[in-house]
Amino acid sequence: MKHNKKAGRVFWCHLAETAVLGALLLCVGAVRGHRVCTQHDITRIPDTSFQSYAAPAAADATGSGQKIVCLTFDDGPSSTTPLVLETLRQKQVPATFFVMAADNNRKYLPLIQTETENGHQIALHTASHEYKKIYQSPESYWQDIAELLQAISPYTDTEKIRYLRFPGGSTNTVSRKYGGSDIMKCLKAQAQEKGYRYIDWNVCAEDAAGGHPSAEEIYRNILREAQNQTVCVVLMHDTAATKNTAKALPDVIDWFREQGYRFCTVEQMDRSCTQSPPNS
């Protein structure tokens, strides 16, 4: 099932609601409209971004003109994940992995231990990624999160995980079909009550779009959307179907470096990047 493309880009969620100033601003003002991620199959990947309005904030992330990029990968681990990890190791770049634990990727869950040992951030994306299931009710969503935490607990310290990304983004409208018009509002409030931070993205690789875009197309998509942005949270996928993302990744990293960006995990960004990433 496809959804119409909409202008705008989701970025910070409740971080944007509480604009944090200091060495790093945790939210970015509304960005200019352009192409967004499209969703092919709402029960699985890819994610979709919908129009959102981030809390107003200065675009300068640090007050000194420093540019920051967070590379984020959804829907893994999979057979593609080792390729991504190898590039990140070679380039000495941290990333944030929003993991799931569906039937088709459970055998790859031990890779989460490798991600953790390599200094990457593990965050939550639900176990099943099935919209009909997770967005049926708040109880269904948190039950799915509980299943994910249980599945990944042998490979990482789940007590330390405080970040998540809602499938479809925090302002998705698909969820209304299953849980009513207030389902996302309720889930965001509950996430905050439970001590979670939720984050979307403002740069989309469109790597999970229909037709399996080439590595060159993925590279161009990212560059197009990252142009003139001081803070970039890049949405990519490390699924079996997105091996071209792994092929594009070295060039993507090189471009951000050439443009003077500093690489951070989402948590490092949240902490104003007080913990220096490997490449700094």
Identify what each model region corresponds to.
Residues 1-70, 86-95, 154, 202, ...:
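Terminal accessory/targeting
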